Amino acid sequence: MNTPARASLPVIKRLPKYYRYLCSLQADGINSISSRELAAQMGTTASQVRQDFNCIGDVKGRQGSGYSVENLLSILEGLLFGNGDRLPTILIGCGRLGKAVSRFITTDTNGYRLIAAFDVAQSEVGKEISGIQIRHIDELESFCAEHHPKVAVLCVPRDGAEQVSGRLVDLGIEGFWNFSHYDLSVPYPDVVVENVHLGDSLMSLGYRLRNQD
């Protein structure tokens, strides 16, 4: 079976969309789907769908019936969420955005386990966020040395993200989910960064509404 590392970034970016749609099919009691039907929903071609599935594992459709929805979901869940191994995750920044993101992490079955939250504001220290007590950022080194988190969620301004990301890499962080309103990059090829810009889709919506024929 091919591993996720062998899939290109564009393929990886499409996997969550496949997953969401297949979940809706399963909820509706649909057991199989053709590459052509999937392509229509994904806005791509049947050939591209087949190429994507060749990248992620032993995914084979049947003549006349297509792909098994259950089998596709099982493969995608293993790739996207792991096989029960939820990644230990810490949150940096416990303002309104941090609180909202923490609720998503702790309530959605997404392969991550929030184990700590940090903030620079002494007024936030000791409060709870999604059932976790907020720590001061000065405790970062000692906590990471003991608990070995793998992922950091950044809900801080740009200057804060730039300052803390280097510290976090030195402490063993392997992945960043970055909400700091700019594209974070780290000079380490083995560290994965996902930059999230919540306003991008809103700007796209505005453009499309204002520029319709």
Give the ranges of each region predicted by the language model.
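Hydrophobic, well-ordered beta-alpha structural blocks that scaffold small-molecule cofactor pockets
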Residues: 3-12, 16-171, 179-181, 188-213
